[in-house]
């Protein structure tokens, strides 16, 4: 990243090795090898399925190969109450490969980072562990011998549930939203747990410009701010943080995650993680209402994806539907036991999502995002403060306006590839 540095909140060292408790934690949090992932119980990464705590679903859009990837890992780190969930939205020519690489490798790096910390890790220690894991993941992508990430990358939103705590980290515009019951009336309220890290966030734009990157929107899509090289109108990345995208890493785009901590209460019911294909057309509250109304928990993720697909067709009939990926994590750890589930979740790997209409032309360009949703309900749980948030972006989620694709027929994460070679850019 040259001289550009992240401006996230400062991580506090947990200190100490935790004595015998720390040694036991390090034994439990021993990461398996990547070639052993398929044999790990409780780890699911299929395109449609459920675990004992979560349900997942993805559907391919109309722009080519599905570049979204998902993960649920029950018993993460050997903890009975540990669950790690993630959604990864790739972009660029090799975005689908990047997203799957992150899906498989990032949890192992987080496990290793946690193993090196003391027992009973506080939020500050988890902030540090997530930061180390994300940094190691991006380093792995840069040095990978056969994966070209120069103009390809991926978002990441990860949620780790340990007991009554949620620890979250994200880069890009995939999002986590909490469904919680209102104190009075029993209705559901949506609480946005992460912030969409796009170039129009003031602190993100400031960093990019200080690193000589440019931020502006094209005339035909004025609501989509993008990141451009200082000497070329490329690549036009529509997010401020991402894995990969090394053509922009010297110009302000970073892979340092924003970290969030949430203490759960009995009113908190579930967490939705989804790619921007969902949030471009549905508000947080609409998504929570759809999941809450699902007659079957095991079908909740599929119901939300199908609702988003219908909204794309209804609201933006001239737009190409984006890939949609959803993970629904139920915080009580329970899942209904239907026998008609389309997949058992342990140790399944189906690399492609639902198949697109073969009669509709496919485009090989990745997708992109948009400014979108957050509606604060006065007096609701949504007014609770997220711990660990950088003060300069703490209010961004509530300040973001819900904005669909009005007047835009097609939105991609990248506009075009740079005209120069990687050797020229690095040299």
Swiss-Prot record:
GO molecular function, one term: protein serine/threonine phosphatase activity
Binding site for Mn(2+) 2: 89, 276, 322
Record's keyword terms, sorted: Hydrolase, Magnesium, Manganese, Metal-binding, Protein phosphatase
Binding site for Mn(2+) 1: 89-90
EC number(s) given by UniProt: 3.1.3.16
Pfam name, any one: PP2C
Gene3D superfamilies: PPM-type phosphatase domain (3.60.40.10)
Cofactor note (record): Binds 2 magnesium or manganese ions per subunit.
PPM-type phosphatase domain mapped to chain residues: 53-331
Manganese recorded as keyword: yes
Record flagged with keyword S-adenosyl-L-methionine: no
CDD domains found in the cross-reference section: PP2Cc
Reaction equations catalysed: O-phospho-L-seryl-[protein] + H2O = L-seryl-[protein] + phosphate; O-phospho-L-threonyl-[protein] + H2O = L-threonyl-[protein] + phosphate
Cofactor: Mg(2+); Mn(2+)
Name of the protein in question: Probable protein phosphatase 2C 64
Organism: Oryza sativa subsp. japonica
């Amino acid at each position: 990243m040259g001289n550009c540095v992240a401006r996230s909140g400062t991580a506090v060292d947990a200190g100490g090795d935790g004595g015998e408790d720390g040694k036991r934690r390090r034994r439990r949090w021993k990461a398996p090898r990547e070639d052993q992932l398929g044999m790990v119980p409780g780890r699911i990464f299929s395109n449609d399925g459920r675990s004992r705590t979560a349900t997942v679903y993805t559907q391919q859009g109309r722009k080519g190969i599905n570049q979204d990837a998902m993960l649920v890992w029950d018993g993460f780190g050997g903890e009975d109450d540990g669950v790690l969930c993630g959604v990864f939205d790739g972009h660029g020519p090799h975005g689908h490969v990047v997203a799957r690489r992150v899906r498989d490798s990032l949890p192992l790096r987080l496990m290793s980072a946690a193993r090196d910390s003391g027992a009973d890790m506080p939020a500050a220690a988890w902030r540090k562990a997530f930061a180390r894991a994300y940094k190691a993941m991006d380093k792995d992508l840069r040095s990978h011998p056969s994966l070209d990430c120069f103009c390809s990358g991926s978002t990441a939103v990860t949620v780790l549930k340990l007991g009554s705590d949620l620890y979250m980290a994200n880069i890009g515009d995939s999002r986590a939203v909490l469904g919680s019951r209102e104190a009075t009336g029993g209705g559901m309220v949506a609480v946005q747990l992460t912030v969409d890290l796009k170039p129009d966030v003031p602190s993100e734009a400031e960093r990019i410009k200080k690193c000589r990157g440019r931020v502006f929107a094209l005339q035909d899509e004025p609501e989509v701010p993008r990141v451009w090289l200082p000497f070329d109108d490329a690549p036009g990345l529509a997010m401020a943080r991402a894995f990969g995208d090394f053509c922009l890493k010297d110009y302000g785009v970073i892979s340092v995650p924003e970290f969030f901590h949430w203490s759960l209460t009995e009113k908190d019911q579930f967490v939705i993680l989804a790619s921007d294909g969902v949030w471009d057309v549905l508000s947080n509250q609409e998504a929570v209402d759809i999941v809450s109304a699902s007659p079957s928990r095991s079908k909740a993720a599929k119901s939300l994806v199908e609702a988003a697909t219908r909204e794309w067709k209804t609201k933006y009939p001239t737009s190409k539907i984006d890939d949609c990926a959803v993970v629904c994590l139920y915080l009580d750890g329970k899942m209904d036991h239907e026998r008609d589930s389309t997949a058992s979740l342990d140790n399944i790997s189906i690399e492609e999502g639902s198949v697109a209409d073969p009669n509709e032309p496919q485009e090989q360009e990745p997708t992109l995002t948009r400014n979108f949703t957050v509606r604060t309900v006065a007096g609701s749980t949504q007014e609770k403060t997220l711990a660990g948030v950088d003060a300069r972006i703490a209010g961004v989620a509530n300040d973001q306006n819900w904005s669909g694709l009005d007047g835009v027929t097609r939105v991609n994460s990248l506009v075009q590839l740079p005209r120069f070679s990687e050797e020229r850019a690095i040299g």
